[in-house]
Each structure stands twice: as structure tokens, then as C-alpha cells.
């Protein structure tokens, strides 16, 4: 009977030692895992390995989105520039072309004093220097706009935005007319010369004046 009885103190010591050993092993594993987590270089290397080696769809296999967008934007910008350079000439109607030709024969010397100014409303005018300078600048712009309205065919009956569009078309028409006239006549103006070269050319072309003798002098026959 005594052989089958176990000492309680021995059983308790055995159990307690097993618990301590298992706890120590767990602590060692936790310490190793904690040290690995506290190492940022090791964590970064692990993430890089997982992303760039084991992930076939990583960013190394595909170009970045920003570079693709930049390339697309540059290509589209070049295409827009080519379209602007190759813009076809706008065809004008017969009525508008005749109106442009009539306007081109009118005088372009417009006195700003003859242009009617709009009526100013009764508002208080500030004496601040910045306000005065801004008001003068707006008045100069308005004066140039009114003169341009007189130069553009039908510009006095349009608002400012429509008149500016019409001015662009009118300038293009005038440039085409100048190009056509130059092609038809075939005349190319000579390059401008400075005054010194022009004086040298004139002296070589025109002969010197003949000598003049007074009353008491002898004639050319007597000299011979």
C-alpha cells in the first residue's frame, strides 16, 4: 500500500517545475519576437522581400501612376500645340468678306477725343492714390476698347467679348490679304541701309560737279 502512495510534496514540486520550465520557454520565444519587432531594418527587409520578390504585381513590375499621367499630359499638350499650328483658315461668307474689304479702305486715324465716353454714374470718387491709379488704368483700357470698336467692322454694335472675337477674325483676314498681295506682285522690299552706306553709294554713283571759274579767270581753251 505504501508503494502506491505518492508523496504530495514531491508531486507539487514536479508540477511546479514543469510550469516554470514552460513559462521560461515561452518567455524566450516572446523575447525573440519582441526583439524582431523592435528592429525596424529587419521589418523593412521582410516587407520588401514579401512585396518585391513574392508579389508579382508589385510596383517594380509596373511603372508608377504619376509618371504615366505625366507622359500622357505631355503627349496631349504636344498634340494640342500641333493642332493650333495647323489650324485651318476660317472661311468667311461673301457678305462678311465684302464688309471687311470696305472696312479695310476706311481711315485708321481715329482721334480719341472724338470717341464718345460712357456716362459716369454719380458715385463717390476716392482720393486714395491706389484707387486713382486703378481708375486711370481702367479708363485707358476702356478708351482703347472704344477705339478698337471703331476699327472692327460692326464693333460698335457688339459687346466687348464678341467684338474681340470679331477683331481676331478681322486681323486674320488682313494678314491673308497682305500675303496674297505680296504673292501677286512678287515685290520684296530691299533691306534697310544705314546712312553711312547710303552716303558711300551715292558718292560713287553721282559724278563730281565741274569746276567753276570767275570772270577774271581763263577759259578751258586757253589752258589747253
From Swiss-Prot:
Region (Disordered): 22-42, 68-88, 183-224
Phenotype upon gene inactivation: Impaired pollen tube growth.
Comp. bias (Acidic residues): 78-88
UniProt entry keywords in alphabetical sequence: Developmental protein, DNA-binding, Nucleus, Transcription, Transcription regulation
GO MF terms held by the record: DNA binding; DNA-binding transcription factor activity; protein dimerization activity
Induction details: Negatively regulated by ARF3/ETT in the abaxial gynoecium.
Pfam families in alphabetical order: HLH
Protein location: Nucleus
Compositional bias of kind Basic and acidic residues: 28-37
Matching InterPro entries: bHLH_dom, HLH_DNA-bd_sf, IND-like
Compositional bias (Low complexity): 68-77
Residues in bHLH domain copies: 125-174
Subunit composition and interactions: Homodimer. Interacts with SPT.
Protein name: Transcription factor HEC3
Native species: Arabidopsis thaliana
Amino acid at each position: 500500500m505504501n508503494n502506491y502512495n505518492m508523496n504530495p510534496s514531491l508531486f507539487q514540486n514536479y508540477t511546479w517545475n514543469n510550469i516554470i520550465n514552460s513559462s521560461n520557454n515561452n518567455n524566450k520565444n516572446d523575447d525573440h519576437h519582441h526583439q524582431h519587432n523592435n528592429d525596424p531594418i529587419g521589418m523593412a527587409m521582410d516587407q520588401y522581400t514579401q512585396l518585391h520578390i513574392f508579389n508579382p504585381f508589385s510596383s517594380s513590375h509596373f511603372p508608377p501612376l504619376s509618371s504615366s499621367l505625366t507622359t500622357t499630359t505631355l503627349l496631349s499638350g504636344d498634340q494640342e500645340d500641333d493642332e493650333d499650328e495647323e489650324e485651318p483658315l476660317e472661311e468667311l461668307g461673301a457678305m462678311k468678306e465684302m464688309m471687311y474689304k470696305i472696312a479695310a479702305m476706311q481711315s485708321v486715324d481715329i482721334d480719341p477725343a472724338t470717341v464718345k465716353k460712357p456716362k459716369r454714374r454719380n458715385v463717390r470718387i476716392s482720393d486714395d492714390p491706389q484707387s486713382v491709379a486703378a481708375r486711370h488704368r481702367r479708363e485707358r483700357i476702356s478708351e482703347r476698347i472704344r477705339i478698337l470698336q471703331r476699327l472692327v467692322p460692326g464693333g460698335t454694335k457688339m459687346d466687348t467679348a464678341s467684338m474681340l472675337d470679331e477683331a481676331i477674325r478681322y486681323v486674320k483676314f488682313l494678314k491673308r490679304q497682305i500675303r496674297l498681295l505680296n504673292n501677286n506682285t512678287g515685290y520684296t522690299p530691299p533691306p534697310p541701309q544705314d546712312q553711312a552706306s547710303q552716303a558711300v553709294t551715292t558718292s560713287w554713283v553721282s559724278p563730281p560737279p565741274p569746276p567753276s571759274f570767275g570772270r577774271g579767270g581763263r577759259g578751258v581753251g586757253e589752258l589747253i
